A protein has these predicted regions:
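Acidic/histidine-rich, surface-exposed loop or edge segments in extracytoplasmic proteins
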Residues: 36-37, 198, 269
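Extended ligand-binding clefts on enzyme/binding-domain cores
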Residues: 190-191, 201-307, 314-325, 337-368, ...
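CBM-like carbohydrate-recognition segments
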Residues: 35-86, 93, 98-105, 114, ...
């Protein structure tokens, strides 16, 4: 009788173990493919965000050697030291910095070495400074610093400081091949505020020389005084748009242009010491822009390519939306923005961005290169759009409102 009872207990134990094993098998972790396929159902799940970010990065990096698939392809898009690539590098570096994502440093380091750690060819042009942000970020990761990797950046910025251009910021005259407009030896267009000042501030951190930050600070506020609309706190792309209006009679504020500025200010706040005399001023600018930007989001979660448009430009657009969502998410994460007010805007923006990710990993609905609101299609992609998306994804990995 006793042996029968013991045998029964053993069988019961085996049965319970088998049941537990079956339950564990039934609850196996979903694969990356499964997470990606259901990305819209679990867009805020960190595991899903991780898969989406990896898919976008891999898709784009695999195609860097041939960009002719892009609508409105131009030869300068292939310039790996230019702003189109540079904006992508900023996003990939932030994504690679997350635990477990270190493999994404490899293509950045390969490009830096192949390009000999050189800035772009145009000495003064802000667009050709953004690649320096990648160089300095990679340099900062080194345990034993190799100063030669940032020598060219130092020499170029020293030359600019010594010249200290004082020209007008008016965007006038014909462009000069290889240089741009005459005014572009300074930051006379709002995009430049994402491309250049961060490189200067990062160089101060790398060298200990405050002159670089002071120069960037001076030029940033000169551009802001010139291009910012005091009523809306938004930026005109350049002086050509001061008096222009759209078909509805609105001032023309380009979404990606303001995205460049807004994300650029967030990036400055991330690297500028909080005891710097201008830190509070940047933070106030950031908060003022946040209030305006949050109020201009549309019901589908996107911002229109022309921010004040009510009827026109109804198509989604992901580069402006990416930079806006990134800036807002960062502010909520850092406690600079009220979560109750801004977290719903961030969530709508992130859902919108995820909806634009195609099944092969391509990000669609990215407005092609331009300087103003324009048409955009689902099949449009661009490297800077991926950069904006990855900046946002990095913040969404720790977004907990």
């Amino acid at each position: 009788m006793k042996r029968t009872r013991q045998m029964g207990l053993r069988l019961l134990g085996v049965a319970l173990c088998m049941t537990a094993l079956c339950a564990c098998a039934a609850e196996a972790e979903p694969t990356a493919d499964e997470l990606f396929a259901k990305r819209m159902d679990n867009a805020f799940d960190p595991a899903t965000i991780d898969v989406i970010g990896d898919r976008l990065t891999d898709w784009q990096v695999e195609r860097l050697d041939d960009l002719t698939y892009l609508r409105n392809y131009r030869n300068n898009i292939a310039d790996r030291r230019g702003w189109v690539h540079g904006a992508m590098y900023v996003g990939i570096f932030n994504w690679a910095a997350l635990p477990g994502n270190e493999r994404h440093y490899e293509p950045l380091l390969k490009i830096a070495e192949e390009e000999k750690w050189l800035l772009g060819d145009r000495l003064f042009h802000g667009d050709d400074h953004i690649v320096g942000q990648m160089y300095l970020s990679l340099y900062n990761r080194e345990e034993e610093k190799d100063g030669e990797k940032i020598d060219h950046t130092i020499r170029q910025l020293n030359t600019i400081m010594a010249a200290d251009p004082q020209n007008s910021l008016e965007f006038a005259g014909d462009g000069i091949r290889g240089v741009g407009r005459a005014c572009q030896i300074r930051w006379c267009w709002c995009d430049a505020l994402f491309m250049s000042p961060q490189t200067w501030i990062m160089l101060t951190a790398a060298t200990g020389d405050p002159q670089y930050t002071e120069f960037a600070d001076k030029e940033f506020w000169a551009t802001t005084e010139y291009l910012q609309d005091p009523e809306t706190h938004l930026y005109f792309r350049d002086s050509r748009y001061f008096t222009q209006q759209d078909e509805e009679g609105n001032k023309i504020f380009w979404a990606r242009g303001n995205g460049w500025v807004y994300a650029g200010v967030a990036n400055i706040l991330r690297i500028l010491p909080q005891d710097h005399p201008s830190y509070a001023k940047y933070l106030q600018l950031y908060k003022d822009m946040s209030k305006t930007i949050a109020g201009l989001q549309h019901g589908n979660g996107f911002w229109r390519v022309s921010l004040l448009a009510k009827e026109k430009y109804e198509s989604p657009e992901t580069s402006g939306t990416g930079f806006m969502t990134y800036g807002l998410a960062w502010g909520v994460n850092e406690g600079h923005l009220d979560a109750e007010t801004y977290a719903p805007v961030v969530r709508k923006g992130w859902n919108a961005l995820v909806s634009a990710v195609q099944d092969d990993g391509m990000l669609g609905w990215v407005q092609p290169i331009g300087a103003a609101p324009d048409s955009v299609f689902e099949t449009d992609s661009q490297l800077y759009g991926v950069g904006a998306f990855l900046l946002t994804a990095t913040q969404m990995m720790r977004f907990d409102d």
